[in-house]
């Protein structure tokens, strides 16, 4: 959540369809504080699709006198959690934690053939092993795929 809340409009590259993740947001002694990410590999540039870019552009277009240095999401972690809980209740689905969205995103990419090394970089994991430890259960069909390749 901290990486998301630290994003500014300057971090978005509409031409190259990327977002630069280069800082983290925290509340320290009731103050909004921007810090460096946890690890060097947490600093990264990720590709995003047109849907994400259009949402950010709409936020820019509807903001009051926006500046590139403005936060894209000026809400609290608590507010995000509350809004997600409300959405889940309205949709009559089990409660989802914000981190579950990250996990679902990673699982979706991995199950659709995205290389584990690429995924690890996207997530900002310091070691690929971390990504493997969390997501290796997503690839149960890998043995079948291996057999298909070998049988060609």
Please annotate each region the language model reported.
Residues 2-7, 119:
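Alpha-helix N-cap/helix-start motif at helix boundaries, enriched for small hydrophobics
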Residues 26, 30-36, 114, 133-152:
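DNA/chromatin major-groove-contacting recognition/catalytic segments
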Residues 6-58:
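Conserved tyrosine-mediated DNA breakage-rejoining catalytic core shared by Y-recombinases
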Residues 16-21, 97, 108, 120-138, ...:
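Short functional hotspots where side chains directly engage DNA or cofactors
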Residues 46, 54, 61-75, 81-121, ...:
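Short, basic (Lys/Arg/His-rich) helix/loop patches that form interaction surfaces
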């Amino acid at each position: 959540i901290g990486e998301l809340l630290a994003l500014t409009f300057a971090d978005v590259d509409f031409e190259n369809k990327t977002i630069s993740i280069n800082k983290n947001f925290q509340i320290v002694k009731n103050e909004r504080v921007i810090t460096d990410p946890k690890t060097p590999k947490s600093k990264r540039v990720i590709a995003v699709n047109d849907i994400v870019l259009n949402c950010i552009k709409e936020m820019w277009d509807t903001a009051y006198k926006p500046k590139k240095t403005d936060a894209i999401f000026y809400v609290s972690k608590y507010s995000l959690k509350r809004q997600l809980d409300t959405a889940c209740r309205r949709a009559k689905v089990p409660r989802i934690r914000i981190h579950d969205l990250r996990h679902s995103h990673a699982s979706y990419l991995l199950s659709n053939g995205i290389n584990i090394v690429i995924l690890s970089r996207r997530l900002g994991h310091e070691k690929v092993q971390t990504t493997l430890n969390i997501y290796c259960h997503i690839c149960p069909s890998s043995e079948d795929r291996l057999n298909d390749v070998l049988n060609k």
